[in-house]
Amino acid sequence: MKFPALLAALFLLCVGTLLLSSCSEAEGEVITLYVYNWGEYISDGSEGTLDVNAEFEAYCREELGLNVKVNYSTFSSNESMYAKISSGSAAYDVIIPSDYMIQRMVAEDLLQPLDLSLIPNYQYVDEAFKGENVYYEDDTDNVYSVPYFYGMVGVIYNTSIVHEDEENVGSWGLMWDDDYTGDILQFNNSRDAFGTALYYLGDDDGDGDFGINELSAESLPHWVEALKLLKKQKSVVQGYVMDEIFNKMKSGSAAVAAYYAGDYLSMYEDNDQLSFFYPKEGTNSYVDAMCVPAQAKNAELAMHYINFMCREDIAVANAEYTYYASPLTSVRANADYQECMSEVHEDAMDILYGETAASVPTQAYMNLSPEGLSMLNELWEELKVESTIGDGIYIGCGVILVALAALGIWQMLKKRRWAKLYD
């Protein structure tokens, strides 16, 4: 009887060991959530701020029983993000494009519908971003995205270089002012750069349409006028930039730049000589929103992440870090958030949400037709390549001059050497 009992005990011991090992492996299995966002667009734990991604990982362990690792990377333009997603070269679970790009990606089946039952914090999204008020066409049922931040484009200028009584302060004209040649920064993406020129050209009919969303054979002449403006601007532009603008404007190495209101507040915190206005002619309004790509491997977890980002404490942390306008009513009503923003800039809430933000005409970008996108790429290429060709001509001329000079010196030395031989 002892031998069968011993076998039974050994059997139970082995089974128990296997079960414990299996449980341990399950608890230790890491699920990687791939998130693709704009640069400087989340509270990351720097300088004492909340590390939102680390908080989500802790939330997953404690509330969902999952061992999650957030793999977080950034992009600098909608177009670069789109190129990566559409090529299939990388699989992300959460992406945060802008309104017009969301519309394009929906049309191309690059996004999957969201399950709002997994995103209960969606209830805190302001009604201005839902239903018929949705920030891009073709999604009045709010199927494909949840708004993250929104805002408007304005002009940032350094008051130690640009005087407040300057004639062009308040107008897009400041971006073309030759008094600041070599000190002006322009967007390094086609929609925003052409947008500055189209808004500067104005809304002739007074119907609120600046022609920014229609590019076809019929409307091409209007865009060619914008191209002429951008070509004219090249003589005063220091460079075409995106995230590089932060260091340039903070350090004072540039005087004027078109950029987003939230980023102005961030720059102002480090350089209080910077000022800002929304151009009187009109400007772009935009919404960046959280989406799940069609090829996401962890779609359900991605929606938990989106819901987490809409939780009040997390959304407040992100809003206090980025200084962008939040679409969540819970954030705007938060007293700590209001106090934080007033410490950054006395007019911060007005710039983001108040009369200043409502004082000029605005129009949001919508997706261009395939024909329009092709035309835009050609126009942008013409603008940028002309610069490259110009640089190439100068470099080529320089090389030729150096070569001719070297040839002349060589011939002179050769003559002297032969002259010595015959002396």
Q: Across the structure, where does each feature detected by a protein language model lie?
A:
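Extracytoplasmic ligand-binding site segments that recognize negatively charged/polar headgroups
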Residues: Y36-L50, S98-K250
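C-terminal motif of bacterial Sec signal peptides marking the signal peptidase cleavage site
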Residues: S21-S22
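Paired acidic/hydrophobic, glycine-rich loop segments that form the ligand-binding mouth/hinge
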Residues: Y92-P97, Q238-G239, A255-Y260, S275-F276
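Periplasmic-binding protein-like
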Residues: A226-K231, D270-A294
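Early extracytoplasmic/lumenal segment of secretory-pathway proteins
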Residues: A26-E108, D391
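A ligand-binding cleft/hinge motif common to bilobed small-molecule-binding domains
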Residues: M101-R104, V256-Q273
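Conserved C-terminal helix/tail region of periplasmic/extracytoplasmic solute-binding proteins
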Residues: Y353-D423
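Mature extracytoplasmic/periplasmic domains
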Residues: D288, P293-V360
